[in-house]
Every structure is written in C-alpha cells, then in structure tokens.
C-alpha cells in the first residue's frame, strides 16, 4: 500500500536515532503531520490528533521498565488507531441465516468486483452463497458478475435485457431463499457520480423496501480521500444498519483520508480492498491496520513489552496479597515472576531502566552473568517439575530432586539452591506478616488504624 509508507521509516529512525528525545519527538510529529496531510486526511483531524499525542506526553509517565521512546510510539499507535475507528471490530459473521446483503455505491468504485470478493469470503467460511445482479445501467455488470461467480463457484441470478432493478433484486432474492442459500449478496446500480448522493440514496431506498436486506453496504473508492466524509455521513444517516467497504487501498495515496473521513462519521468500516485478486479483501481492524503502517515488528515488540510489565505488576500484587495473608506463595508464582522478568530484557537492561539507579557501573558484569545463568537454570528446573511439585514444593524429596535435575540438565545442587531460595522467601514472608501484625497491634493500642 502507498498509504503512509514513510511512517514505518520514521518509527525506526525515532526508536534507533541518536538525537535527543525532545528533538526526536518534534521531528516525528512533523513527519506524522506531513504524511497524514499528503494522505488527504482532513487538516483539522491531523492537528487534533497531534495535539492529543502532545497532551498525553505531558500528562502520562511510561511504566517502569518501558523506555520513553517506546512509550511515545505506543501513544502514537493508540491515537492513530482512534483516528481510523479505534477498537471497533466489525461483525462479519451473520447472527442469522438466511442473511441478505445489499451493495450500493457510485459508478467506478469496484462494487461488482467487491460483490464477487465478498461472496468468495463467505464461501470460504463455509456458507452457501448466491449473487444477484441488479445493476441494470452498466451493460457489462451482469456479465462481469457471472464471470466472477463462475470463477469462485457461486451461482448468479440475473435477467439480461431487463431494466427493472427493483424487480430483478426481488425475484433474485426470492429464488435464492427458495434454494436455501445462507448468504445472498445483491449488486445494485452505480450510475450516479459523487455529488449525486440524493439520487443514489433514493434508489437504495426503493430496492431496500422491496427486498428488506439484513445489511446495506456502501462501497467507496479510497482515491476520493476525505470527500468520503459527505457520502459516508449521508449514507450513515439514511441507513442505520449500514456498513462500509473501502476499495482500491493499494492503488492510492489517499486511503488514509478516506478511512479517517469514514471513521469520523461513526460508520463502521467492515472490509478494505487491498488488491485486484478475488481474495484481496480483508476485515478492517483499525489497530491491526495502524500496526502495519507503523511497522508491525516494532509495534508488536513494544506492546508485548508493556504487556509483560503489566504481568510483572500482577505478580507484585500477588506478592502483596501473600504478605497480607490473603494468598499462598508457590513455585508456580516464582516461575511466573521469572518469566515476566526474562521477557522484559537482560538484567543489565532492567537495572538501567530502574528509576533512581545511577550506580550501574558498580554492578560487576560477572555478577550480572551469574544472575542470568541462575535464572535460566531455575526456569529449566521448574519446567521439569510436576504441577503438584510446583504447587506444593514441600513434597520434593531427594529422589524427586534427582529426577528433576536429570530432566532439566542441571545438578542436584542447583535444585537444592532453588528450593532453599523458595524456603527463604517463605520465611521472609512469615516475618513480614508477623511485623505487619505487630504494627497493627501497636496502632490498635493507640487507637490508630493500619493502612
């Protein structure tokens, strides 16, 4: 896709560049504005987006272990996703059978091709699909639909030479209903140009009254950019059950403008056409789409890292619960804690990211290496334990230790060391619990409350 190609490079440059953080942020925001405006996104929307990004930068602090640059890209990812529809996940599988979809759109949008792509999409999902050709104004429309139907093995209903579009649509739907088709797609006329929305909507109303579809889908060509706003908003007002398909996303630089314009109306973008082939129609997911624009690998890495930090925070909460007497610490908890730490990066990197630790040079390299090696061994040991052993380490005797050491490729001494570490944690927790009770007792004597 030509859409926002240079943003991927901008993300990479931002994450790996050597300029100061503030300068890098300023440069990236300029690049973002330039890219969005050249993709025909409405200027007001662009500046509203970048203002939100700046506002969040001012008010939000990155979680512990997350670098500022990574957190900035996460904010950009969130706000760009909102620009294109946020967390809206279109419902593509119908909740009833039979299900009638009526396609409308102006001429030249690729509506008939889209009808074929849609039929292929649902056929692949295992539905019995029928196509109705009710575009009576374009001479080759029915012929094109029949060719597509033949290519994908889907029956097509049409009446060559007949000019009554409403009648054709009605008879086609009735025929397929009698044949127990599960999804019926009706291709209607696209004889009106942009700016003639009223006539298009009037025709849509007449066919709608005749066939009572379950869904009306407007097909829009991505190359019209932000002009899609007027068409989509009028369509959205006229048809509350309406969804939208944006075609030709691969062949224009204005796709971003079309997507953001449609999203601004509140209409649901269901699919986007990403090429000419019959299978090049994809369900539109704003977050997945933005991840691809920004560079899927970079975004996934950052999101995964943030998720791991959240997992680690959950582990910390679990420890707090154990100390307060609400829970019990098991080796399974120790395992989850180590996994969360491991995924957040090497120990040296974690020490760098910890706020307030400016003594990195004082932590010997060989000590860090020993820590990494110990972590690796302990994970291997716990992977060789049964669920029963993880949940109740007190049952691990010498013969079990031998089996665990053999299964994990470690020494019995390593297994003993892990068990000793676990027992030390247990003793520490008991001590903390006792202290907590003593403090509460003391506060009680003075009529205070524990916090």
Swiss-Prot record:
GO biological process, one term: SRP-dependent cotranslational protein targeting to membrane
Compartment annotation: Cytoplasm
Reactions it catalyzes: GTP + H2O = GDP + phosphate + H(+)
EC number: 3.6.5.4
Keywords, in A-Z order: Cytoplasm, GTP-binding, Hydrolase, Nucleotide-binding, Ribonucleoprotein, RNA-binding, Signal recognition particle
GO cellular component: signal recognition particle
Protein's UniProt keywords contain RNA-binding: yes
Keyword Nucleotidyltransferase: no
Signal sequence bounds: none
Primary enzyme class: hydrolase
Molecular-function GO term, any one: 7S RNA binding
Binding residues annotated for GTP, in chain numbering: 105-112, 187-191, 247-250
TM regions (residue ranges): none
Subunit description: Part of the signal recognition particle protein translocation system, which is composed of SRP and FtsY. Archaeal SRP consists of a 7S RNA molecule of 300 nucleotides and two protein subunits: SRP54 and SRP19.
HAMAP family with a match to the protein in the record: SRP54
UniProt similarity note: Belongs to the GTP-binding SRP family. SRP54 subfamily.
Recorded domain comment: Composed of three domains: the N-terminal N domain, which is responsible for interactions with the ribosome, the central G domain, which binds GTP, and the C-terminal M domain, which binds the RNA and the signal sequence of the RNC.
Protein role: Involved in targeting and insertion of nascent membrane proteins into the cytoplasmic membrane. Binds to the hydrophobic signal sequence of the ribosome-nascent chain (RNC) as it emerges from the ribosomes. The SRP-RNC complex is then targeted to the cytoplasmic membrane where it interacts with the SRP receptor FtsY.
Record-given protein name: Signal recognition particle 54 kDa protein
Native source species: Acidianus ambivalens (Desulfurolobus ambivalens)
């Amino acid at each position: 896709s030509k859409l926002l190609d240079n943003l991927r490079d901008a993300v990479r440059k931002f994450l790996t560049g050597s300029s100061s953080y503030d300068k890098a942020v300023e440069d990236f925001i300029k690049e973002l504005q330039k890219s969005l405006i050249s993709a025909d996104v409405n200027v007001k929307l662009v500046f509203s987006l970048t203002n939100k990004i700046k506002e969040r930068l001012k008010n939000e602090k990155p979680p512990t272990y997350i670098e500022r640059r990574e957190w900035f890209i996460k904010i950009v990812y969130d706000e760009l996703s909102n620009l294109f529809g946020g967390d809206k996940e279109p419902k593509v599988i119908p909740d009833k059978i039979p299900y009638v979809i009526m396609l409308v759109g102006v001429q030249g949008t690729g509506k008939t091709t889209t009808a074929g792509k849609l039929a292929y999409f649902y056929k692949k999902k295992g539905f019995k699909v029928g196509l109705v050709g009710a575009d009576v104004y374009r001479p080759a429309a029915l012929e094109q639909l029949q060719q597509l139907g033949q290519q994908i093995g889907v029956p097509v209903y049409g009446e060559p030479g007949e000019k009554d579009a409403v009648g054709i649509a009605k008879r086609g739907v009735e025929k397929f209903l009698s044949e127990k088709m599960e999804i019926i797609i009706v291709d209607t006329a696209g004889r009106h140009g942009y700016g003639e929305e009223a006539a298009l909507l009037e025709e849509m109303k007449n066919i709608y009254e005749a066939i009572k579809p379950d869904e009306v889908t407007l097909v829009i060509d991505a190359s019209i950019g932000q002009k899609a706003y007027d068409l989509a908003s009028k369509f959205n007002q006229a048809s509350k059950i309406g969804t939208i398909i944006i075609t030709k996303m691969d062949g224009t630089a204005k796709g971003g403008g079309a997507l953001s314009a449609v999203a601004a109306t509140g209409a649901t973008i269901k699919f986007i056409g990403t090429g000419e082939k019959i299978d090049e129609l994809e369900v539109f997911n704003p977050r997945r789409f933005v991840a691809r624009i920004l560079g899927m690998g970079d975004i996934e890495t950052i999101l995964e890292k943030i998720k791991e930090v959240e997992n680690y925070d959950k582990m910390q909460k679990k420890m707090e619960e154990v100390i307060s007497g609400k829970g019990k610490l098991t080796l399974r908890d120790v395992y989850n804690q180590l996994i969360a730490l491991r995924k957040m990066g090497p120990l040296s990197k974690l020490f760098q990211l910890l706020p307030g630790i400016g003594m990195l040079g004082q932590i010997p390299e060989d000590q860090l290496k020993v820590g990494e090696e110990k972590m690796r061994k302990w994970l291997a040991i716990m992977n060789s334990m049964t669920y029963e052993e993880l949940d109740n380490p007190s049952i691990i005797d010498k013969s079990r230790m031998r089996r665990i050491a053999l299964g994990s490729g470690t020494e019995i001494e390593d297994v003993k060391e892990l068990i000793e570490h676990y027992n030390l944690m247990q003793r520490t927790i008991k001590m903390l619990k006792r202290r907590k009770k003593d403090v509460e007792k003391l506060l009680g004597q003075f009529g205070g409350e524990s916090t």
